[in-house]
Amino acid sequence: MFRGIYETTIDAKGRTSLPAKFREVLVDVHGDDRFVITNSAPVDLGAGTFSSGLLIFPYAKWVEFEENFRSSKGLTSAQRNSIMRTIISPAVECCADKLGRLLIPPHLRKGAALERDILFVGVMDKIEVWSQAEREKVRIQDLKNFPSDSETVAELGL
């Protein structure tokens, strides 16, 4: 499982470092140092504004996602096309070098507004990548959407 939030930077050419803990999970848990990086689904911030980060999937999890997507029946044609254009088409297979460095392609950096200060956020079986400013906007939206009744939260074991 990917857990934790790690602050780092990205340079003008898109070079950054994947946190060591996340590299360990890729190899030790998923048995593969390859991963796929792509756009995340847009987060509706209200008033017609959206925020988007990036997602990093272990390679096997990405293949599983593609298989599930191909066999899914509950999507409209428009939803299917939107997911293909937003998430599947821009996806890039990557591998960090021995020092943990990776290169995030320009088309993904631009869509996620990654310029300097970024966050790697562990979310169970995937990793989110955010600009710090965009992540703060989404965090505020998450607080608004957080279950307000203690019963729902207690069911989760919190």
Curated annotation (Swiss-Prot):
Its main location: cytoplasm. It is found in: Cytoplasm, Nucleoid. GO terms for biological process: negative regulation of DNA-templated transcription initiation. SUPFAM superfamilies: AbrB/MazE/MraZ-like. One of its GO terms (cellular component) is nucleoid. Pfam families: MraZ (PF02381). Keywords: Cytoplasm, DNA-binding, Repeat, Transcription, Transcription regulation. PROSITE patterns: SPOVT_ABRB. Residues 5-52, 91-134 form the SpoVT-AbrB domain. The keyword Metal-binding does not apply. PANTHER family: TRANSCRIPTIONAL REGULATOR MRAZ. Belongs to the MraZ family. Forms oligomers. This is Transcriptional regulator MraZ. It comes from Geobacter sulfurreducens (strain ATCC 51573 / DSM 12127 / PCA). The gene is mraZ.
